[in-house]
Amino acid sequence: MRVFLLCAYILLLMVSQLRAVSFPEDDEPLNTVDYHYSRQYPVFRGRPSGNESQHRLDFQLMLKIRDTLYIAGRDQVYTVNLNEMPKTEVIPNKKLTWRSRQQDRENCAMKGKHKDECHNFIKVFVPRNDEMVFVCGTNAFNPMCRYYRLSTLEYDGEEISGLARCPFDARQTNVALFADGKLYSATVADFLASDAVIYRSMGDGSALRTIKYDSKWIKEPHFLHAIEYGNYVYFFFREIAVEHNNLGKAVYSRVARICKNDMGGSQRVLEKHWTSFLKARLNCSVPGDSFFYFDVLQSITDIIQINGIPTVVGVFTTQLNSIPGSAVCAFSMDDIEKVFKGRFKEQKTPDSVWTAVPEDKVPKPRPGCCAKHGLAEAYKTSIDFPDETLSFIKSHPLMDSAVPPIADEPWFTKTRVRYRLTAISVDHSAGPYQNYTVIFVGSEAGMVLKVLAKTSPFSLNDSVLLEEIEAYNHAKCSAENEEDKKVISLQLDKDHHALYVAFSSCIIRIPLSRCERYGSCKKSCIASRDPYCGWLSQGSCGRVTPGMLAEGYEQDTEFGNTAHLGDCHEILPTSTTPDYKIFGGPTSDMEVSSSSVTTMASIPEITPKVIDTWRPKLTSSRKFVVQDDPNTSDFTDPLSGIPKGVRWEVQSGESNQMVHMNVLITCVFAAFVLGAFIAGVAVYCYRDMFVRKNRKIHKDAESAQSCTDSSGSFAKLNGLFDSPVKEYQQNIDSPKLYSNLLTSRKELPPNGDTKSMVMDHRGQPPELAALPTPESTPVLHQKTLQAMKSHSEKAHGHGASRKETPQFFPSSPPPHSPLSHGHIPSAIVLPNATHDYNTSFSNSNAHKAEKKLQNIDHPLTKSSSKRDHRRSVDSRNTLNDLLKHLNDPNSNPKAIMGDIQMAHQNLMLDPMGSMSEVPPKVPNREASLYSPPSTLPRNSPTKRVDVPTTPGVPMTSLERQRGYHKNSSQRHSISAMPKNLNSPNGVLLSRQPSMNRGGYMPTPTGAKVDYIQGTPVSVHLQPSLSRQSSYTSNGTLPRTGLKRTPSLKPDVPPKPSFVPQTPSVRPLNKYTY
């Protein structure tokens, strides 16, 4: 048997531990009273007088003395007779008016306070005896106190200073009470609220106080309540925890005590200060492996008897910067006394942690004891205490242990709402047997919660949230902000079955129960579990009082078991029912709420409720049975009200509509994963589309023919051709660029419109617009017919490749333009050895074909042909002489340069004035490389192209090196200048022109003046490297250092560094293809 009992006890402990570890869930209210129902309750707003119709109450405190409720506010104290039953308004029967003097208000304004603060807010209202009451007010930041008679509220005596008895500001908290004829007060004692003090004054003996500016005693406290118990006076407050400073700024709840017979210390230690001041922490927390604390005390009750034990009940909240949460904890006075008899806490150094003081280091008599009591019974007064005891209590006022709550857990918690609980009032003798404890808790959202408390640790049931009441009246209470909805205080009037709920601007009188709401439905009445309500013998639900035991009643407060009861089939009252009263009427005591069983058409959210849970909810199973119709019909419109004379069929059970938390988490996680997968696929497909597009463009660009195969070299001036150059197909032969400069008899249109001639018929991409164009290439001088034969043969050899690959035929510039610096071309094609014509490369057929082309495309005079032929012969002879000199190792370079200059002079063309045609203007760098489709017939044969007999123009030096392609039959001599002429580190690299080319301007020796971007720049000769191809098979020329004077650059205006890539329309000259 003993073994069985031991096992049962162990099992009970294990179950209790498991229950303690789990965090308590918020209870759903069994009944809800919304604003539509609570707005009928009487409201107190203060009595307007004269021009104070808009006067705010500015509630400060209320106190019940016998059958009178005293309400203190700004400048006034009201009295309300509790025996009167108010209907819509609570009317005070008396009023005490105490306003600040004009001088005090002016001084308050001079201190920088707002005029609304410069009033007399009543902060202390403490009865001294049955006839007199001690009243203190802020008096425009100059606190003063008076005595008044309780019966008449008449001023009696003189004003006394309210310093250390009343705060300066109405927003500062304070407490006060009389014990043994002495006033104990706790407040701030200065204008800046920096000197918090617990003070004793009046009566016999000297005034005592806490040590000034000592954070170990009190640090930024908010005093909430003071009670007298035994030989001590207890103060409940919250403050900044000094033992928690190393970990951050936190607020802890405290209880402090002092002896009523404390006389202060000796002249050496603690003179005129408390010698018995001790404080301890109030621990309101949820137990478990890691405690969850509710550290901030908001309100606490007087000492009440809970199961015969003196107890105080308080409401606690989480830290202000934490998640909102509230709890109700009860503390027995015995546990508080036990903590004060325990160990002390100390901090040896400012940086060390707080530890417990060993018992052997605690002096005798024990600090905190009262003289002539207990361990200090041998001492008559506290002045006789030894200095060691006084010094110890001065530096060790904090106890090591915290006061635990009853049952080591809160009675009630509320953590899943956005508001905190702020006020509390307890009825510890509720029910017909007065054995239940009902707690009323106010919140900062204007709600009042009615809780049936679990007061016994052996009870199998937890606390039950009976009702949730929306007490704040929006219509009658003037709310300037959300703070005005906060419940400041609760006052229980059990004799008149009422609760007074105080807000800053009004006070609402609420009955403790609403038994009439359940009507004649027994199941609803029993399921409410309200200790104030019971099923009466008359067949209705009504309020149960201790005097009704003999009459008989039925209730089940512990469990609310209604399984043996049937469903309610109540005939609801209608508007034609004699005892029905209009909703909101001033004489209605049976008005209907939104959660009541009796539904009203004016409250659309009403739904049938299951009796055992009694929560309002909209359901689709709601049915109404009409009296005249025996058949049941579904009421499909829940928001249209209820017809007259209906019978409500309450469902016997309620299906759980809640979704399990695991299912909800799984669905959320699955939705997240699915969404992430879909998003990833979409991003991948979107990116892949662009990657494929970029690859296609890249392949098209790679397949394009490189333009480095061109045999011509182009010069780049003034930042031209900045855009990247793309290559063309490799099979375009080298001399094509020299042989495609055809001319024709066709002239440009007068308007110069060439939009249709810009794009190639094969749709070449516009990226090639930055390549040199024929507009940027000077007109090559006409060759002899024999020279053209060699080109014809070469063109005939490459005919097949020309048919397979796209060709471009840039158009020639307009021929008739005046000669000036602005017309000097910015890019020229330099001659090389392949442009010299040898008889070994020609035959008669090619000569005839070339001659035919020349006769068709270039009608020239015979004199010009002979002159060109003679000039070609002279240039060939001069070149042969030059080669001989170069091959001669004993030749003098200076002599060679002189010969070159003489050759240039001999090869000069006719004077500028006699030219029939002038060189073209400088083209735009964005001109397209593609010839317009209209310039060349689609099926035209491949032709050797010659140039018109236009006199040459001065050549410019090269700034850009073009890549070129060599094959077995042709070699080109190309040189480039990698840096600009005006670059200080640049070395001019140039190529010696062919001697047989006519039309070059003579190159003077010495320094030249070059035009760069329209500005004359002095250019000095610099050494250059050149390479020339031999005209014969005698090998290549030796690479020698040759100097050449820089050519004149065009006098053109500067061009932007970044120009658009798209080719612009350029007019074509008369030489078309």
Swiss-Prot record:
PTM-bearing positions, type Phosphothreonine: T773
Basic and acidic residues composition bias: residue spans: 790-805
Polar residues compositional bias, start-end: 931-942, 980-995, 1021-1037
Domain Sema: 27-512
Regions that span the bilayer: 663-683
Record region (Disordered): 744-775, 787-825, 839-874, 914-1005, 1021-1073
Signal peptide span: 1-20
Alphabetically ordered keywords of this record: Cell membrane, Cytoplasm, Developmental protein, Differentiation, Disulfide bond, Glycoprotein, Membrane, Neurogenesis, Phosphoprotein, Signal, Transmembrane, Transmembrane helix
Residue spans, topological domain Extracellular: 21-662
Segments in the Cytoplasmic topological domain: 684-1073
Residue ranges annotated for the PSI domain, each copy included: 514-569
UniProt-listed Pfam families: PSI, Sema
A GO-annotated cellular component: cell surface
Residue positions with a glycan: N51, N283, N435, N461, N631
Disulfide-linked positions: C108-C118, C136-C145, C259-C370, C284-C329, C477-C506, C515-C533, C521-C568, C525-C541
Similarity remark: Belongs to the semaphorin family.
Functional summary from the UniProt entry: Shows growth cone collapsing activity on dorsal root ganglion (DRG) neurons in vitro. May be a stop signal for the DRG neurons in their target areas, and possibly also for other neurons. May also be involved in the maintenance and remodeling of neuronal connections. Ligand of TREM2 with PLXNA1 as coreceptor in dendritic cells, plays a role in the generation of immune responses and skeletal homeostasis.
Name listed for the protein in its UniProt record: Semaphorin-6D
Protein's organism: Homo sapiens
